[in-house]
Each structure stands twice: as C-alpha cells, then as structure tokens.
Swiss-Prot record:
This is ATP-dependent RNA helicase RhlB. A motif (Q motif) lies at residues 9-37. The lineage of its organism: Bacteria, Pseudomonadati, Pseudomonadota, Gammaproteobacteria, Vibrionales. Coiled coil: none annotated. It comes from Vibrio parahaemolyticus serotype O3:K6 (strain RIMD 2210633). HAMAP family: DEAD_helicase_RhlB. CDD domains: DEADc, SF2_C_DEAD. Residues 397-437 are annotated as: Disordered. DEAD-box RNA helicase involved in RNA degradation. Has RNA-dependent ATPase activity and unwinds double-stranded RNA. It is found in: Cytoplasm.
Length: 437
C-alpha cells in the first residue's frame, strides 16, 4: 500500500477502534485519500455504500479499514464456529485477491482477526487447511469460494460485512451469477455492512447494488479528467514493420525503472516477451494461462525490482497494486476505451508522475477516435525517424524458454548498427489527430 497525503482528514480523527488505528499508523498511514475521506465516515455509521473510484485511489484501504473496524465493534453471531467467516471480500482475479490479503496484513497483526484466501489455480488442500484453522475474513474469487461452500467447509450464515471489489470487472468476466449465488446465501442485506466498489457505476452495477444492498449511499470520486494529470501521454503511428524496433528503441532511450507493456492478445504478448528477452532485458510475462505459482513469482519479482518490464494482457490492467511503475507502453491500442484508462492508470499512482506511450499501428489505429472521445482529449503525437531505430535485433526467444530472464549484464562493448538511436526528431505534440485512411 502506498503512503499518500491527499486530504486533511486524519484516520486518527475518525473514531476508529484503537487496534485499527495502530495497524494503520505502523504502516505510516496518517491522512486519508479522497475516497477514504468520503467513504469511511459513512461506513462507520453502518451505512452501505456503492463507491465509484478507479484503482490507485486508496479504495482497498478504505474497505479493509471499515471491515476490520466493523467486526471489532459488532458482536459475532451466537453459536458461530471459528471456521465460519464473518466477512467476505470478493475480487474478480486471484492477483487482486492476493493483493487485498497482503494489504490487510498490518490490520490482521494489530487486531488479531484471522483472514484466509480462497482462489483457483492453487492447492485446494492448502487453502482448506487455512480455513480449518479458523477465519474471520474470507478473501477470494467467487469460483473457489463457491467450491468450498458446496463442500460444506463453511456456510455464509454468519456474514456481517461484504465487499464486492471491481464490480464492473465482475460483469465483464461473467461472474455475476456466482455473486448472486453467494449473496442469496447470506443474511439479509440490512443485517450486514455492504460495500461495493467499481470504476464505473453503470446501470447494471447500480441494479446489483439495489438488489443485494440496503439503501446504499453512492460515493463518487471521479477525476476531472479520466486520465490522471500526472501521466504524460504520447502517441506514435508506427508501421507494422517498425513497431517492434520502435518499442525497443524507446525502451533504450527511456530506460524505464519499471514498465508494463500491454498487448491485446496472448500470442502478441508472447511475441513481445520473446523479442525483449532475446535482447537481454529482465522481462516477465503475465497472461491468462500462465500457471498461478509462476504468476505470483513474476509479480513478486516485478514489485521487488528483479524484473524491469512486465508484458501483459489486460488481466493485469485492473486491481493489481504494483507500486512505482514509471512507464506504460500500449503496444496495441485496446479495443475497449475503459481499458486504455485502466492500463495507463498503472503509472502515475498516488501522487507519482508517469509516462504512457501508445502505438496507433495499422491494425489498431481504428480504436483511437473512440478512445480520445472517451478520455475527452487528443493524445499528443510524436514522430520518429525510421532510420534511427535499432536495426540489429536478435531473433526472439520462443516460449519453451523460461518466461523470466536473469539479470541483464553489460559487456562494456557496443553492438553494430544503429544500436543507440541518433537523430530521432524531437517529439512534437500535434495540433489535431491525423486522419487514418
């Protein structure tokens, strides 16, 4: 969790339980972000909320603080067994569930409440053992939670707090039937504290809130512009044959501390990964079919700085807390306008600055007008000198090789050809977007 000081509202002035305040203070959290300052006073009165806030705004800490505080101030149901959860936090992806659990650890330590994870792609037996040790707060994805429920590992009769994170993404991924299945097996909405968070409060999200929450108050934190003002956006129009060389030239020029390269398909991500790995970059691959253990390892390496570049599909565009991402490269412009916002939102988080570089190539330039209409501004265009691009690129590594390369080495020599691009034209923001034929 990233320390921020965005409002003058202090956690210490909210009337939280001392154990909760202690956990926050030990991690250095003193002031609330806007979503925390708006949501927590409402939640601490026992009022449900449907919150609209994008990733990177501090919403995870908001609902964790409210959940832990609610369980400390609300007597548990009479006759409850230690294996029966009192709170449930549902996330659309296992990576997000893991991140929520990690963010909860300071509060787990300070309050003594027990939390457990339940998500697919990892050993059922290991998670079962954790649940059988006792659980107050269950964090996970709906599929594995339902698996445990149907095996009668626990019931949902004692639920006193519910969080649905990234609700719009739940719809996108087709999990809404699972969500309704779980909601219908919990106590009535008025008997529990309900929290829903979504990047957009669309009609279908509001309908879900109306159906399974008790008179929720809408809390909206929407920036004046959909893309953060701390993010420098830039657009290139590469030909298909220049696209990979341009990416590698820009990486050589920018030399980002931590970058994410987004492509639209698994196959394209593997291709980009192969080229970057062959060129000696410390690069990881994150797509939907990468085994869970390897996904966790790659994310850990990326977060620690052992991997500099992460090549990913949109599976990584939402929900993941990856601090200090300096650059986002949209190798492919996304088909969904909202995905553009979520992708570049990986950088420029919590007050930091960031740089987003997008390619409007021959295949995906058609997506640009809709994206610019959605973000309500044109993206500044830069030109490049094709003759200055890196020419001597090695053949890409195929996927039989490991997905994460070892630390990059410097031989001290120079490579032949135009290895260091010279004479690239200065980047000039456009006056208006050029038309694509």
């Amino acid at each position: 969790m990233k320390k921020t000081h965005i409002t003058e509202q202090k956690f210490a002035d909210l009337g939280l339980q001392p154990q909760v305040t202690e956990g926050l203070e030990k991690k250095g959290f003193e002031y609330c972000t806007p979503i925390q300052a708006l949501a927590l006073p409402v939640l601490l009165t026992g009022q449900d909320i449907a919150g609209q806030a994008q990733t990177g705004t501090g919403k995870t800490l908001a609902f964790l603080t409210a959940t832990f505080n609610h369980l400390l101030t609300t007597p548990e149901h009479e006759g409850r067994q230690p294996t029966q959860p009192r709170a449930i936090i549902m996330a659309p992806t296992r990576e997000l569930a893991i991140q929520i659990f990690n963010d909860a650890e300071p509060l787990i330590a300070s309050t003594g409440l027990k939390a457990a994870l339940a998500y697919g792609g990892e050993s059922y037996d290991k998670q079962l053992a954790k649940l059988q040790d006792g659980v107050d707060i269950l964090i996970g994805t709906t599929g594995r939670i339902i698996d445990f429920y149907k095996q009668r590992v626990f019931n949902l009769n004692n639920i006193q707090a519910v969080v649905l994170d990234e609700a719009d993404r739940m719809f996108d991924l087709g999990f809404i039937k699972d969500i309704r299945f779980l909601f219908r097996r919990m106590p009535e909405p008025k008997e529990r504290l309900n929290m829903l968070f979504s990047a957009t409060l669309s009609y279908r999200v509001q309908e879900l809130a109306f159906e399974h929450m008790h008179n929720p108050e809408h809390v909206v934190v929407e920036p004046a512009q959909k893309t953060g003002h701390r993010i420098q956006e830039e657009l290139f129009y590469p030909s298909n044959e220049d696209k990979m060389a341009l990416l590698q030239t820009l990486i050589e020029e920018e030399w980002p501390d931590r970058a994410i390269v987004f492509a639209n398909t698994k196959h394209k991500c593997e291709s980009v990964w192969g080229h970057l790995a062959a060129d000696g970059h410390r690069v990881g691959l994150l797509t939907g079919d990468v085994p869970q253990k390897k996904r966790e390892k790659i994310l850990e390496q990326f977060t620690k700085g052992d991997v500099d570049i992460l090549v990913a599909t949109d599976v990584a565009a939402r929900g993941l807390h990856i601090p200090q991402v300096t650059h986002v490269f949209n190798y492919d412009l996304p088909d969904d306008c909202e995905d553009y916002v979520h992708r570049i939102g990986r950088t420029g988080r919590a007050g930091a600055s960031g740089h987003s570089i997008s390619f409007a190539c021959e295949e995906y330039a058609i997506n640009l007008p809709a994206i610019e209409e959605y973000i309500e501004h044109t993206i500044p265009v830069s030109e490049y000198d094709a003759s200055a691009l890196i020419q001597d690129l090695p053949a890409p590594i195929r996927m039989r090789a490991p997905r994460v390369q070892q630390r990059r080495t410097n031989t001290g020599g120079t490579r032949s050809g135009n290895r260091k691009p010279q004479g690239r034209r200065p980047r000039q923001p456009r006056q208006s977007a050029p038309k694509q034929s």
